[in-house]
């Protein structure tokens, strides 16, 4: 497995009805010091993330959805950077990298990059005036690698059986982030186009009530914390809210 003993892989079987449990157990048996298979009743995407955080023992935490995948070369670069940070005892709360919209039947792939939004390969704080996200530079779950202890300490609990909670995964922990870094590599392939997928337009229309529930939660959270936010973080979260309102 790429990464070897440097990486702890948690496979969360969230009540799957296919061969997920069998495949997860096979990997855990073959790589007992690397892979953990976690079986639980279905609680939805958010609860699977909660379970992963609760079981994680690594320094950093990355969510990879079952539809998606990571680029091998970019993955190597990310691991190299994170390993060096840990060895040098450098404080970093979140690492941002690029993601690719991998749409079905579309040859040309759109890449979400953050050049110009913040310096590359430098640890900075939200007080840094160079942080300038534009309104088209969406930071999604696919972009971030959080420090595991930050996720545990901030008390993040994504709601069960609710779609679109990945937005809460960005929004709520981010106010606890003191140090961040951008690595300009195309790491995450975000697969779009599977029938019934939560971001499918028809599916989103059917679940607009859940989108609105998440949006109300984001607005309330922002209202309760906005006075304490550094200017750059305030601007980032406000733009994020604006994007979510447009989607809804």
Predicted features along the sequence, with ranges:
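Donor-binding/catalytic cores of nucleotide-activated saccharide
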Residues: 45, 69-180, 188-192, 196-205
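Active-site acidic Asp-centered loop
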Residues: 14, 64-66, 96
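Short, acidic, metal-binding catalytic loop of nucleotide-sugar glycosyltransferases
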Residues: 1-6
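Short aromatic/hydrophobic "clamp" motif used to bind/position activated sugar donors
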Residues: 61
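C-terminal subregions of glycosyltransferases and related glycan-biosynthesis enzymes
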Residues: 191-248
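A conserved acidic beta->alpha catalytic loop
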Residues: 13-22, 43-44
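Active-site-proximal specificity loops/subdomain of glycosyltransferases
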Residues: 33-36
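Glycine-rich, basic loop-to-helix element that forms the pyrophosphate-binding segment
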Residues: 40-56
């Amino acid at each position: 497995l790429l990464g070897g003993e440097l990486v702890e892989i948690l496979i969360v079987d969230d009540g799957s009805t296919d061969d997920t449990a069998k495949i997860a157990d096979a990997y855990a048996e073959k790589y007992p010091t690397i892979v953990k298979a976690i079986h639980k009743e279905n609680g939805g995407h958010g609860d699977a993330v909660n379970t992963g955080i609760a079981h994680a023992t690594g320094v950093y935490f990355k969510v990879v959805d079952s539809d998606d995948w990571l680029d091998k070369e970019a993955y190597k670069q990310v691991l190299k950077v994170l390993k060096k940070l840990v060895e040098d005892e450098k404080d970093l709360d979140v690492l941002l990298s690029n993601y690719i919209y991998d749409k079905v039947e579309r040859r040309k792939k759109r890449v979400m990059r953050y050049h110009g939004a913040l310096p590359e390969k430098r640890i900075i704080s939200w007080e840094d005036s160079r942080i300038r996200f534009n309104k088209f530079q969406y930071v999604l779950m696919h972009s971030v690698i959080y420090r595991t202890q930050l996720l545990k300490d901030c008390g993040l609990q994504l709601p069960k059986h609710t779609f679109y909670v990945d937005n809460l995964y960005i929004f709520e922990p981010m106010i606890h982030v003191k140090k961040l870094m951008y690595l300009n590599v195309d790491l995450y392939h975000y697969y779009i186009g599977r029938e019934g997928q939560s971001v499918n337009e028809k599916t989103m229309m059917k679940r607009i009530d859940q989108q609105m529930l998440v949006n109300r939660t984001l607005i309330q959270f922002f209202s309760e914390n906005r006075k304490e936010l550094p200017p750059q973080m305030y601007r980032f979260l406000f733009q994020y809210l604006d994007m979510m309102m447009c989607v809804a």
